[in-house]
Amino acid sequence: MLGTGNALVTECYNTCFLIEDRKQWFMTDGGGGSAVLHQIKHAGADWMAIRHIFVTHKHIDHLIAIIWMVRMICQFMNHGDYPGDACIYSHKEVLDLIRDLANKLLLSKETRFIDDRLHLVEVHDGETVSIIGHDVTFFDIRSTKAKQFGFSMDIGDGRKLTCCGDEPYNDCEEQYVKNSEWLMHEAFCLYSQRDIFDPYEKHHSTVKDACELAEKLNVKNLLLYHTEDRNLAERKRLYQEEGIQYYRGNLFVPDDLESFEL
């Protein structure tokens, strides 16, 4: 986990993560700035080895760091220090924004590699793409705030990892979420603190909500992210104490830079 926090956190980084298999890396979202490079470094990864990036939606706590990745990739390509290609996957709205921001903010000697060796790959609802040797099926979560996609990855032996983006589960996602080996789902705050953080008016959920969902849909491992950071030192303990009241599977509340074996 490169980051685990929501948009306005200051004590941890915005939610984004890496999946690695046989030294191949798949990155989902980037957070809000150049600190993503720090997070990648301290996660023990090489940014240059991250050849596949997925962006869920256009909100700046997910998108802006992707422009830094575009800059790094294209700058090193221009210097002759980046062999091969890279891909950024998303829906059309996000890809158009990335292309527009890059052309306005970066040098033409760098942006000339976009759509040549840095491929902006549009994905559609229900489309499956092979990424780092795994079938990844992207799906529209039907957000009412900004068009957003999640994904479900085949991780072998009939198991799947499903990421719902940063909004509560929608019934249209059932075929992807149900029976997942791993579910990555947002939990803005504790249910007991819902009157403090107002998650529902922000179209987010609580620990209780996410855990009840995972229990209902037979999820084996639930990982919560995109949280508040008011009491970060106690977040893991407090979230797990609330969550285990509603969920009998394995509940994970990661810190930034924490990793898990899938």
Language-model regions, residue ranges each:
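Active-site metal-binding motif and surrounding structural segment of the metallo-beta-lactamase
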Residues: 34-86
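Short histidine/acidic/glycine/proline-rich micro-motifs that form metal-
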Residues: 5-7, 60, 88, 94-95, ...
